[in-house]
UniProtKB/Swiss-Prot annotation:
GO BP of this protein: D-ribose catabolic process
Species assigned in the record: Clostridium botulinum (strain Eklund 17B / Type B)
The keyword Membrane appears for this protein: no
UniProt-recorded name of the protein: D-ribose pyranase
Principal localisation: cytoplasm
Its EC number(s): 5.4.99.62
Superkingdom of source: Bacteria
Catalytic activity field: beta-D-ribopyranose = beta-D-ribofuranose
Lineage of the species this protein comes from: Bacteria, Bacillati, Bacillota, Clostridia, Eubacteriales
Function per UniProt: Catalyzes the interconversion of beta-pyran and beta-furan forms of D-ribose.
Length: 131
């Protein structure tokens, strides 16, 4: 059994195969996942797991250099936005519209679906390097 925090084998596999600038998304339970993207469905019931639990656990395993958020996130879900900023630290944030974010999902290695029900609880993580 793995000793690290992340136990989900599908998510662990995708992260281990990611290279510099590859992208993975984490979304709420309503985010439409394109057919072209690998779906990693973690949602069990409403609210479980949360978006932030999933983001924090993913960041234990994945080095990131940038995140992409919908412009609407800050205005519609300000508490979530502040929590994201706190968790990612000095990582660059790029803002695009929610519609552009949904289109960008097609370029992600995978889209992780959580049980989150907070509006705009969606993020795209761009992989960095550890050296």
């Amino acid at each position: 059994m793995r000793k690290t925090a992340l136990l989900n084998s599908d998510l662990s596999s995708v992260i281990s195969k990611m290279g510099h600038t590859d992208m993975i998304a984490i979304g709420d339970c309503g985010l439409p996942i394109p057919a072209e993207s690998e779906r990693i469905d973690l949602a069990l019931i409403k609210g479980i797991p949360t978006f932030m639990q999933t983001l924090k656990t993913t960041l234990l395993e994945l080095q990131i250099e940038e995140v992409i958020l919908a412009k609407e996130t800050e205005a519609v879900s300000p508490d979530l936005y502040e929590e994201i900023k706190e968790v990612i630290g000095d990582v660059k944030i790029t803002f695009i519209t929610h519609e552009e974010l949904k289109t960008t999902l097609k370029s992600c290695k995978a889209v992780v679906r959580t049980g989150e029900q907070t509006p705009y609880a969606n993020i795209i993580l761009k992989s960095g390097v550890v050296f």
